[in-house]
Amino acid sequence: MPKNKKVPLRKSVVSGDIIDKRNLLRIVKTKDGEIAIDPTGKKNGRGAYIKLDNQEALIAKKKKIFNHSFSMDVPESFYDELISYVDHKVKRRELGLE
């Protein structure tokens, strides 16, 4: 009898929903204090997750969610980069490319 693989679950910092890790995007703060999008989910550092959803990315910018999650000032340009990245990923998913 085949053994079922465990599906890792993570909590979105924006909505608080607990979702399958594959449907989330990881944002990481490295030891150097740099904030980056982590598409592979394997970068070293403190991670926070949001849903791959345009609305969540906009709420994250509006409420400056990552300023609280990482206890530092995250530049506005990072939030803009995040919104465009999420929009790109959502469109690819809708086209069936991912």
Segments and roles (model prediction):
Residues 4-5, 96-97:
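Flexible extramembrane loops and terminal tails that flank transmembrane helices
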Residues 8-11, 44-47:
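Short metal-coordination and nucleic-acid-contact micro-motifs, chiefly zinc-binding Cys/His arrays
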Residues 12-15, 51:
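Short cysteine-rich clusters marking metal-coordination/redox-active sites
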Residues 18-21, 54:
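Cys/His-rich metal-chelating microdomains
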Residues 20-37:
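Short recognition patches in nucleic-acid-associated and regulatory proteins
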Residues 24-29, 60-68:
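Short cysteine/histidine-rich zinc-coordinating motifs and their immediately flanking basic loops
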Residues 50-63:
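Short Cys/His-centered divalent metal-binding micro-motifs
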Residues 64-94:
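C-terminal structural segments of small proteins and small subunits
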